[in-house]
Curated annotation (Swiss-Prot):
The modification N6-(pyridoxal phosphate)lysine is found at K228. The keyword Nucleotide-binding does not apply. Its main location: cytoplasm. Gene3D superfamilies: Aspartate Aminotransferase, domain 1, Type I PLP-dependent aspartate aminotransferase-like (Major domain). Belongs to the SHMT family. Its EC number is 2.1.2.1. PROSITE patterns: SHMT. (6S)-5,6,7,8-tetrahydrofolate binds at L119, G123, H124, L125, S351, P352, F353. It holds the Pfam family SHMT. Catalyzes the reversible interconversion of serine and glycine with tetrahydrofolate (THF) serving as the one-carbon carrier. This reaction serves as the major source of one-carbon groups required for the biosynthesis of purines, thymidylate, methionine, and other important biomolecules. Also exhibits THF-independent aldolase activity toward beta-hydroxyamino acids, producing glycine and aldehydes, via a retro-aldol mechanism. The gene is glyA. This is Serine hydroxymethyltransferase. It comes from Clostridium acetobutylicum (strain ATCC 824 / DSM 792 / JCM 1419 / IAM 19013 / LMG 5710 / NBRC 13948 / NRRL B-527 / VKM B-1787 / 2291 / W).
Length: 411
C-alpha cells in the first residue's frame, strides 16, 4: 500500500500503521476470526467511494448523486447472491452483530423467546448472552453441547425447543469446530413453528467453497461477516428468502443504520468476486487441511482438543491437563510471536477473563501460504513454549520470525 501522504502529514499515525504491519508480518496469526485481505480489497476500502453518503438503497436514495455508488452496491448484492445461491442479499450491515440485530428486529418483538447456543459452548454474544442486547431484550433459552461428545445433541436440542416453543432458533457459532446439521435444525424449527436464523460468520468461506453444508436452502435468514474465512473487509451481510426481503431491508435501514459505508461495500464486492473464482476453493480446502493437521499434531503432544478434532477452520484446546490458563497461555504465546485468544470451553469452570482454553484457527496462516508442514512446526512451537514456559524462549521467537519471513503477506 502507498502511504506516502500520511507519512508526511501525520507521522504518528503512520508509525502506528507500520508497527502493526510489522507485527502481522512477523507473527503467526491464529485468531480464528481474523484474516488478511487482498490488496484489491484494501484499495477498494481506501477509495473515493468513502466520500459518498447514500442513505437508502440503489434506485431509492435520500441523497442525490448516488447513481455511481448504486452500481457498486448492486454488484456486491448480485455477487453475494450468486456466491451463496440466495434469493435476497443485503450488504449494508456494518458488522455481523448489526446483521443479527437487524434480523431480530425484522420479525421479533422485545420479550419474544429465542433459542441460541450458550456462549461457553461455542455460541456468540449476540445469540443471547445476558451482557448483550440480545440477552437484555429477548427471552433467551440457551442450548449447548453434549457432556460426552462436546458436540450438539440434536435430540436434546429438539426436546428443549418443544418445551420452550421459541419464536426463533439461532444456530451458528464462534467456537464450535464441527459440522452443523442445518437440515435437522430446519426440521425442528418446522416442528415448533420457529423462524430459523443461521449466523455463518465463521464458516462463510467454507460454505462458499462447498466444504460445509450451506444453511441457505434451509434457513429463513442467514447472517455473516465478510472477513474471517471470506477474507474480505470488516463488515456484515444478510441473506433471506425473497418473502422477507422488504422486512430485512427496512430493519437495516432506517431501522438499524443510517448511511451505508460505500467504500466497505465496494470491498465486499471485491471479496465476493474473489470467492467466486476457482482458486478460492483450493484456498478454503487448505484452511481445513491445515486445521486438521494442526489438531492432530497438538493431540500428539498431549493437548486435548475439544470434541476430539475439527471439521472446519478452528480448534478449541482445553489446557487443563497442561496446568495453564487460557489467559496465561495467550500471553505466553504472544511473547514469542504467536497470536491466539483465550476462550471458554464447554462446561467452563473459570471466568471468561481467565478461561481453561484457547481458540486457534488457520485462515490467516493459510492466506500467507502455510501448508501442512508449516502447521506441524507451529504445533511444535506451541508445545515447546507451554512445556518450557519458565525458560528462555528467545530461540523460539527467532524461529517464529524466520518461518514468517518465508511467507510474506504484503511485501
Amino acid at each position: 500500500m502507498d502511504f506516502e501522504n500520511i507519512k508526511v502529514s501525520d507521522s504518528e499515525v503512520y508509525s502506528i500503521i507500520e508497527e502493526e504491519n510489522a507485527r502481522q508480518e512477523n507473527n503467526i496469526e491464529l485468531i480464528a476470526s481474523e484474516n488478511f485481505t487482498s490488496k484489491a480489497v484494501m484499495e477498494a476500502m481506501g477509495s473515493y467511494l468513502t466520500n459518498k453518503y447514500a442513505e437508502g438503497y440503489p434506485g431509492k436514495r435520500y441523497y442525490g448523486g448516488c447513481y455511481v455508488v448504486d452500481k457498486v452496491e448492486e454488484l456486491a448484492r448480485e455477487r453475494a447472491k450468486k456466491l451463496f445461491k440466495a434469493e435476497h442479499a443485503n450488504v449494508q450491515p456494518h458488522s455481523g452483530s448489526q446483521a443479527n440485530m437487524a434480523v431480530y428486529f425484522a420479525v421479533l418483538k422485545p420479550g419474544d423467546t429465542i433459542m441460541g447456543m450458550n456462549l461457553t459452548d461455542g455460541g456468540h454474544l449476540t445469540h443471547g448472552s445476558p451482557v448483550n442486547f440480545s440477552g437484555k431484550l429477548f427471552n433467551i433459552i440457551a442450548y449447548g453441547v453434549s457432556d460426552e461428545t462436546e458436540q450438539i445433541d440434536y435430540e436434546a436440542f429438539r426436546k428443549k425447543a418443544l418445551e420452550c416453543k421459541p419464536k426463533m432458533i439461532v444456530s451458528g457459532a464462534s467456537a464450535y469446530s464441527r459440522i452443523i446439521d442445518f437440515k435437522k435444525i430446519r426440521e425442528i424449527c418446522d416442528e415448533v413453528g420457529a423462524y430459523m436464523m443461521v449466523d455463518m460468520a465463521h464458516i462463510a468461506g467454507l460454505v462458499a467453497a462447498g466444504l460445509h453444508p450451506s444453511p441457505i436452502p434451509y434457513a429463513d435468514f442467514v447472517t455473516t461477516t465478510t472477513h474471517k474465512t471470506l477474507r474480505g473487509p470488516r463488515g456484515g451481510a444478510i441473506f433471506c428468502k425473497e418473502k422477507y426481503a422488504k422486512d430485512i431491508d427496512k430493519s437495516v435501514f432506517p431501522g438499524m443504520q443510517g448511511g451505508p459505508l460505500m467504500h466497505i461495500i465496494a470491498g465486499k464486492a471485491v471479496c465476493f468476486g474473489e470467492a467466486l473464482k476457482d482458486d478460492f476453493k483450493d484456498y478454503a480446502q487448505q484452511i481445513v487441511n491445515n486445521a486438521k493437521v494442526f489438531a492432530d499434531e497438538l493431540t500428539k503432544y498431549g493437548f486435548r482438543i475439544v470434541s476430539g478434532g475439527t471439521d472446519n477452520h478452528l480448534l478449541l484446546v482445553d489446557l487443563t491437563n497442561k496446568n495453564i490458563t487460557g489467559k496465561d497461555a495467550e500471553h505466553l504465546l504472544d511473547s514469542v510471536g504467536i497470536t491466539a485468544n483465550k476462550n471458554t470451553i464447554p462446561f467452563e469452570k473459570k471466568s471468561p477473563f481467565i478461561t481453561s482454553g484457547i481458540r486457534m484457527g488457520t485462515p490467516s496462516v493459510t492466506t500467507r501460504g502455510f501448508k501442512e508442514e508449516e502447521m506441524k512446526k507451529v504445533a511444535y512451537f506451541i508445545n515447546y513454549v507451554i512445556e518450557h514456559r519458565d525458560e528462555d524462549l528467545s530461540e523460539i521467537r527467532k524461529q517464529v520470525s524466520e518461518l514468517c519471513s518465508g511467507f510474506p503477506i504484503y511485501k
